[in-house]
Design a protein with these regions (language model features):
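N-terminal Sec-pathway targeting helices
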Residues: 2-21, 28-30
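N-terminal capping segments
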Residues: 30-147
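Low-complexity, Gly/Ser/Thr/Pro-rich intrinsically disordered linker/tail segments
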Residues: 190-224
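A generic structured-segment signal
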Residues: 22-23, 41
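...with weaker cross-activation on analogous glycine-rich loops/strands in unrelated enzymes
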Residues: 62, 123-201
């Protein structure tokens, strides 16, 4: 191969590399902060009765369980972008959010102001929380605090994913460093999907993740 041919091959290789790099960057740009709101199909062929709460905290004619589920879906339908920020208002108001905001907005619009409730609980039971200085604007948006709060204010349920009938749309599921709302749709094995917000690279807000996680530490229902 002469000098001219080597130069031509080098140019071709560089061009191919540039095209490949542009393609990768394009895919990344299309994925970053572009989480889909499209709901996965309910694939379970069996019959699992839905649970309905006897409580309607906000008096809107919709029971708590249904309210929490509907509100979680309504929140992610606004397509919040993932970013951890501090807000003087507590609740994000700029189109950004994290995993705890899915739960906070789902409960808020069902009659449960998590910001006020968690702050009151921290001040009443400071020994239960590892917090040096309480801050109502952020404490309710931390998973570690919600673990403590729900452990004694909500209805505790099984963490065994195989007990599929015990997992109902509108339930809360807590992982070691993450939290979400259980969906009313299920995979082929009857395991429900989870409505959550975990990353700016997340492909969809509602995903089949329960069986894949090994760090489930809590499963709760807001009311009976």
């Amino acid at each position: 191969m002469n000098k001219s041919e080597r130069k031509r091959m080098l140019c071709v290789s560089l061009a191919a590399g540039a095209i490949l790099l542009c393609g990768v960057l394009l895919v990344l740009l299309m994925r970053y902060q572009h989480t889909s709101t499209v709901r996965p199909q309910d694939q379970y062929a069996g019959q699992i009765p839905d649970f309905y709460s006897t409580v309607d905290a906000d008096g809107d004619g919709v029971d708590d369980q249904t309210d929490v589920l509907d509100n979680a879906l309504a929140y992610v339908d606004t397509r919040p972008k993932y970013k951890s920020r501090y807000y003087q208002t507590g609740y994000p108001d700029d189109g950004y959010g994290v995993c705890t905001d899915v739960v906070a907005f789902a409960l808020k619009n069902a009659g449960y102001d998590l910001q006020a409730l968690v702050d009151a609980d921290i001040r009443e039971h400071p020994q239960w929380y590892d917090i040096r200085q309480p801050d109502a604007n952020i404490d309710f948006r931390r998973v570690r605090n919600l673990k403590v709060f729900f452990s004694h204010t909500a209805v505790a349920l099984t963490t065994e994913v195989s007990e599929t009938e015990e997992w109902q749309g509108g339930d809360l599921v807590i992982f070691e460093k993450h939290i979400g709302i259980v969906s009313d749709r299920r995979n082929r094995d009857g395991v429900p999907y989870v409505i959550h917000h975990n990353s700016p690279w997340q492909s969809a807000y509602e995903q089949d993740i329960l069986e894949k996680r090994t760090d489930i530490v809590g499963h709760y229902r807001i009311s009976e």
